[in-house]
């Protein structure tokens, strides 16, 4: 009811936010798809795309709000799976939950001096590591190398790219505000 009233009362503002949200989501999905177009070694691709994705989650949160950022956080693992970057389908909810916690922690800590830079990526990395471990236990995956690779991918890169993505978004927002 309130949403309808707002939509009728403030149509240009509502439309502007809807359009901006759609553009931010489209840009994030396009950046995530770079790995399909630009052939990069896996480690470079992981850290570059991961940083850009975390930057877009942060920018979307700050420019369009929590709802749009949470929607983006849900779409990203689905597109990663469709692109072949998420090998185990049971990891989809793990990545979605990690993105959700990242966005919510970032929204909560945005005005805290250094906590916003470190805590959301750390919480996401720990949560995704625990979630991936649970999934691998459920699957009873025996191959030690595959287990190690998946557990690493769900932890350390999330922490590093999360911090880098937040820092990049902050620098970009500073530049945008000066324009």
Task: Please provide the spans of the model-predicted regions.
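Loop-helix junctions at membrane interfaces
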Residues: 1-179
């Amino acid at each position: 009811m309130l949403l309808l009233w707002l939509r009728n009362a403030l149509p240009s503002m509502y439309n502007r936010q809807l359009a901006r949200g759609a553009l931010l989501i489209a840009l994030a999905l396009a950046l995530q798809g770079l790995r399909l177009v630009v052939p990069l070694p896996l480690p470079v691709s992981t850290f570059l795309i991961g940083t850009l994705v975390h930057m877009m989650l942060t920018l979307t949160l700050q420019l369009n709000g929590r709802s749009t950022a949470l929607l983006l956080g849900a779409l990203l693992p689905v597109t990663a799976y469709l692109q072949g970057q998420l090998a185990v389908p049971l990891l989809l909810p793990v990545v979605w939950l990690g993105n959700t916690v990242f966005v919510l922690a970032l929204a909560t800590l945005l005005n805290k001096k250094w906590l916003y830079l470190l805590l959301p990526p750390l919480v996401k990395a720990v949560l995704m590591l625990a979630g991936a471990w649970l999934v691998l236990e459920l699957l009873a995956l025996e191959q030690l190398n595959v287990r190690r690779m998946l557990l690493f991918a769900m932890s350390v890169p999330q922490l590093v790219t999360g911090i880098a993505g937040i820092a990049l978004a902050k620098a970009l927002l500073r530049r945008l505000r000066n324009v």
